Amino acid sequence: MHLEAARVIFFLWIFLQVQGIKDLSIKIYGSEIKDIDNAPRTEATKNTAKTYKVSTMRRIFDLAKHRTKRSAFFPTGVKVCPQESMEQILASLQAYYRLRVCQEAVWEAYRIFLDRLPEPGEYQDWVSVCQQETFCLFDIGKNFSNSQEHLDLLQQRMKQRNFLERKDEVVTKETLGELGQTPGLQQTLPVSHPGPCLSLPMTTAQRNPQLHPSRTPRVPTRERKIEFTDAAEDALEQKVELSISLANQKFKSELDNSQSPYYLEVAAKSQLQMQKIFKKLPGFKEIHVSGFRPKKERDGTSSTEMQLTAIFKKGKAEAKSPASDPLSLDSNKIESEGDPRGTTEEEKQRELYPTASELRKLISRALEEDQSLDVGTIQFTDEIVGSLPSLDPDTQLVLPTLLTDITKDATLSPELPLGQPRLETVDRAGHSPPGASPTDGWSPPAMTSTSLSETLPFFTASSVFPQTDQSATDIMSIDQTVLIPRLTVPTDDYSAISPLVPEISHLPTSSEDWLSTSSQDTMEYLDGVDLTKTPTSSEGPRNSVGMFPAWIIFLENITPDPGLRYITTSAMTVAARGRELVVFFSLRVANVPFSTDLFNKSSLEYQALEQRFTQLLVPNLRSNLTGFKQLEILNFRNGSVIVNSKVRFAKSVPYNLTKAVRGVLEDFRSTAAQQLDLEIDSYSLDVEPADQADPCKFLACGEFAQCVRNEWTEEAECRCRSGTQALVLPIEDCEDIPGKGTPCRSLDQSKNQVYEPGVKKFQRQQDNKVTMKRKFELLTIGYEEFNYQDWEGN
């Protein structure tokens, strides 16, 4: 009994001890959470809490040991590789920090002081200077605030505010200031030179040049001493003076007085409206309204002609910089890497600012496309030598020296209607046609089948073109063939015209100048002349030699129209005269064998391969290139398989067209090699814009045919050589029929060698057209289903 009582007491004591320790642990842990900073702890409490924490950290550490080890990425975008040392990591972070700070500083300077986006070249210059610590950050802002562009911008804003607030007051000419001057800012403005920057300790990148190669500091090309002089302005700017007629705006007498409130109100509104149109043009700075004057239209009504002066930036040859490569504002690159497909220095300079002729084309196109203005005619002042205002509608221009610069190679044919210009081959080397001596006069037939009316439309803005020195003007380049449309000259007094043609002893030897300035300006106006609407007249012969319509001036310097030239910058590509952009490209597929059926566009193999490349290329071009319109597979050539194609785009695109197409094709080549089992030779990629490409290079003609290029339309076509004739017309649609030779055959072949009678051949052509139409409809339906499935899959 006594033993059992002792055992019970022993177990009870053990139970109480265990329970007390447990309560003590809970109390210590609770007090630690509540009073972790203020409550005093005993040594036992500290040891217990430490044991508890260590065990928790050990459990977390044990779990972390089972995770996969990977490289650390900083949220800034700098990747830290495991093999880098601590000094290299710090150097990379510091360099990236300096780059981002400089990018933001320069970007904000352009946005705040100049209110525009920077050009890639100047942006890179300033970022490089900032990274090299040539300027302190705040000195960059001081330089921008004292720049001429910023002061001109302030002057422009002040003028706009004065026009709106004080339009009811009479403002003197001295208050407004003369055009090109800055009132109140004529004195030389002191520019604060950069003070001594705080010398930072030498970083790891400076101690180790191999980690971060140093660059030579390039100070941006900016005026240190700003003076508003004509010389400095002419060196940095170019002015374009033009006048536009507003057909629906009647002229009021108040517009004659430049100090009247009505004049100031109209000028302010017109200036703001023109700024909205012109700000889209590259290099535009400002525009001013020079004045208004009345103009009498051809129908007798009166309209208003507004004179404008637009100021653009002008690129200089010495402003070229090796750092003019475009820089992405979100780029993480610390060092500039050269682009293996980069443009040359000349191309970079050409991409900065357009030339004077390109500006005129851009301005004309922008005004014509704007719907807010009813623009009648556009005339540039620098193109006018003499002005004949207020012409009577029935009065025609008298140009006594109109045909002074006609070359001997220009052939005038009286036998072709004006609506169908004939293509004539002309030798640029200066040789006379066979059977004609250099001194022979022009002796056309006595009667002409088509004549011109005396009331033909001519240019609204009249011009007088003086006779120019033949030796000082490059008319044509040598050793090239151009195509000239024949025209009918409406006169019977041929003896009077013949003495007007000067004798040309030589032609220019330059093969680079395609045209002279006068012909370039003239052809811009010919774009708006519709020769097919020319009326015919049966009136008698004319008495005056000079009574020719003004569009005949294109016979002066008969060089082909250069209107297809594209205006290309780093941020846009624009086709001149409102045409669509065209790019030719070719690529070679190495692992596809070539067969003779690919010469025949009607063969199933040709159509299948054409459909395959169309389905592969069109989605890539459409999704990656804004303004894409059409892809045309021109032909397949031997050499494994060489695919020649033509891509059509809109009139203007917001990127460099050639670079963008090449980039898309490079991506397509990589994708085709990985997913489609197509080995495209990277060295075979050839991308050429239509204004620089030779269309005959991408057009395959037959053995007895030759490629002929129309210099006006920039289109190429196959034509039979002399002594041959076409089997099927048009020749460009002919195919090599297996077993039946080439599309053209010699004329000396016997009639027994004719392949088919005329009736059967015509019937076969019609059957082929119907078959091709059905196949094309089936291919179109299949291609639409393919696009729909591809869209749903995405």
Swiss-Prot record:
Q: Which UniProt keywords apply?
A: Cell projection, Extracellular matrix, Glycoprotein, Heparin-binding, Hyaluronic acid, Receptor, Repeat, Secreted, Sialic acid, Signal
Motif range for Heparin- and hyaluronan-binding? 629-637
- Provide the residue span(s) of the region labelled Disordered: 202-221, 314-355, 413-449
Which terms does the record give in the GO molecular function aspect?
Answer: chondroitin sulfate binding; heparin binding; hyaluronic acid binding
Q: How is it modified after translation?
A: Highly glycosylated (N- and O-linked carbohydrates and sialic acid).
Q: Which residues form the SEA domain?
A: 236-357, 579-692
Q: Where is the composition biased (Basic and acidic residues)?
A: 332-351
Subcellular location as annotated: Cell projection, Cilium, Photoreceptor outer segment; Secreted, Extracellular space, Extracellular matrix, Interphotoreceptor matrix; Photoreceptor inner segment
An annotated GO cellular component of this protein is: photoreceptor outer segment
> Which Gene3D superfamilies does the UniProt entry name for this protein?
SEA domain
* Chief localization: other
Q: What InterPro entries does the record point to? A: IMPG, SEA_dom, SEA_dom_sf
Q: Which GO terms describe its biological process?
A: visual perception
Q: Give the compositionally biased regions (Polar residues).
A: 202-213
Signal sequence bounds: 1-20
Give a yes or no for keyword Secreted in this entry.
Answer: yes
Give the record's glycosylation annotations as residue positions.
T425, T439, S443, T448, T450, N624, N656
Its function? Chondroitin sulfate-, heparin- and hyaluronan-binding protein. May serve to form a basic macromolecular scaffold comprising the insoluble interphotoreceptor matrix.
UniProt-recorded name of the protein: Interphotoreceptor matrix proteoglycan 1
Protein species of origin? Bos taurus
State which gene encodes it. IMPG1
